[in-house]
Amino acid sequence: MPTIVPFETLTELFINLAEKHKGKGKNQFYFKPTPNSDYQPIEWGQVSDDVYSLAAYLVDKGIEKGDRVGILSENRYEWAIVDLAIQLIGGINVSLYTTLPPSQSAYILQDSGVKVFFVSTGFQLKKAVEIFDDCPDVMEIIAFDEPKLEHLQEEEYVYMFEDILLEGGKVLEENRNKIKKLSQEVEPEDVCTLIYTSGTTGKPKGAMLTHKNIVSNVKAATQHIYWDHTDSLLSFLPLCHSFERTAGYYAMISSGVEIYYAESVDTVSKNMPEVRPTIMISVPRLFEKMYNLIVKSVEEGSDAKKAIFNWAVETGRKYSEGQRGLVTLQKKIADKLVFDKLKERTGGRVRLFVSGGAALPPEIDTFFQCAGMNILQGYGLTETSPVMAANKPGQEKVGAVGTVIPGVTVAIQSLQDAEILGKVSGEDYPTKLSTGEGEILCKGPNVMKGYWNNEKATKEMIDTDGWLHTGDVGKFDEGFLKITDRIKHMIVNAGGKNIYPGPIEDLLKTSKWIDQIVVVGEAQNFMAGIIVPDFEAVSKFAKDQGLKFENNEELIALDEVNDLYKKEIRSFSKELASHEKIRDFRLVPNEFTVETGEITPTLKVKRRVIADKYGHLIADIFSNDND
């Protein structure tokens, strides 16, 4: 639907929303004051008061248009009003992932020149205090929560959020004209945020996104997918991620959708039945975990339970393909016996699941479609603000990331000779264009201004014709965009064949025994896998077999466990081409995590880190290859 107010900048979005909802008691945000409390609403009157008080404080401290203000916080109400205050005065939001180590946080603050730094908890404040002396531009640190360690609060440059809101309220009148002047000076081409790409290699790069970049993407998204004031969203993907920022925040408030903040990523399953949202925006990892939990539950059940489940899935498949008549009645029975229980876990009201950030394995996409819980896949990059393509409700294509959104053009460029194999704009539909595989390029108002302080990287990303090179391999299939993998992930085996590990990994991750996997085999005669088992499932298997083990290391060393994985991989590899089949593997005792450095904050695998960390296992796999 169209947005509920006109706007060309995020500054105008806030001002016009505040004016529209003034005095009407419209709730916008919901949060939990304590873990055991109910969700509390915050209406637009309070949002407006808080934003103006905060803007007054920042202006009074000398923050001007174009100055950078940092946020290191989980998703919460305070994050939103700090951002809106930054946008109101023409500042630039620099948000950091809470999982970043101090050294990376310091680098981002130094590179961007952040002047005021907002942090959430005592834990994040401790990190900020630790790096303060290394960040000469930072004038003060403002904490949302009062820290338990009193000495942190005693630092002369540390202030409490409640205190500065009160102070801002006191100086609001004397700064109101300055705020108005700054807000009127904001132009669509002005940078509104620096989003530092976590990157699987090298130092983070700050993508400069303008008001026009994000506003164009918000408007295109609201044309492409319908939501309105009757909807509610449970927000849990990090707001420093461009996907959540654009789709789960700006697009939502621009359409009147109410936003509930999950207590944390770990409490999403608990919060869903409490909130009963109608929209869920996530990454494939959540859907993979939901799917594997369901499969695990079914396989541990009786033969009758398995038969009912398989019948329900087959019935759902027939119904999703358009079969009616008797199938309609069977679908109602399948819902009652199987699928309604699954829907209850999400609160029972979700009408839109939106997935982005990575490709969703087709098997998982198909399963949720059979359950009547369609997932709308989308595709984009931080550098494209982020959405380039998305599926529309009722027009989904399994295995595709959708059609190109309005205002954007996507092209496929040959990897061999750089020829454009085909291109589609959002305005070209209906189109049945199909192409071969190549690199995905993008052009449009959503393409970033460039990388902050990094002209070299900007020129490598955006060519002289204005095409942004995504580094992803994909193709058009009757107008729908399909993603294969990252170009840099391509493995060239000893026979010279090009193999993309992503689709192989996606297939194997649908096994209930496999939590994470990285395919290896560069310049080798076969493919192999470094596998993180699903420790809950395999522990139960070992105990049921009467096997003894004290920890994960002992568990993965058991012959019976390795035999189990050999059979499972052999079974799944039947679906793969000969040169793609996994011929060997090694189990590892620990999950790949952000904290241990194997994955990025956006849950992308750092293949080089894993290759280094488990190099001895990889060498062992291929040491006996005498083919």
What are these regions (language model features)?
Residues 29-84, 101-106, 160-164, 211:
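Conserved AMP-binding/adenylate-forming core of the ANL superfamily
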